[in-house]
Amino acid sequence: RVLALSAGDEVELFLNGQSLGKKPVGEELALTAVFQVLYQPGELKAVSYKGGAIQGECTLRTAGPVSALRVEASRLALSAGEQDLCILTADLVDEQGVMNLWEVKPVTVRVEGAGTLLGFGSGNPSCSGSYQDLCWDTFDGRVQAVVRAGKEPGPLTVTFSAPGCSDAQVTLLVNPSDFR
């Protein structure tokens, strides 16, 4: 069962390029179209129409085996002085960059330079580790680290590693603080 939410007039659902038909949406239907779909790996795309014109679309793809870590940082520059924080998210992705939510891998974090690791974890509600641990199993394909800028300016490099993946690294710039 696939639920497609849209503020348009109707939604068309495609499975691996084949249309599964259009269904109406609207306030009387709680802006939701319901499709009965047999699972197939590949691509599922919903296209929203309003007045016959495409209003928007959303695509989901089946993830393949994990081949890499993808890291995103909440910011790339911090101010020295031990007040600024950055949240780094490391996701397990396949060769096409699709996040794999199902595979579990232990991920290790290493922090070098002008800052420190404040905490590291996966968000798994049933885990028993400490946020000070340097290795966590992914949960829903993800781990997160929080780093804090140090007292002095300079580069702050955060490296994530997992079995079967190349290391993923982000270098943040810790700038001199404006406060004295």
What are these regions (language model features)?
Residues K23, S67-V71, V109-S126, D178-R180:
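Short aromatic-acidic-glycine turn motif
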Residues A63-G81:
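Low-complexity, acidic Ser/Thr/Pro/Gly-rich terminal tails and inter-domain linkers that flank the onset
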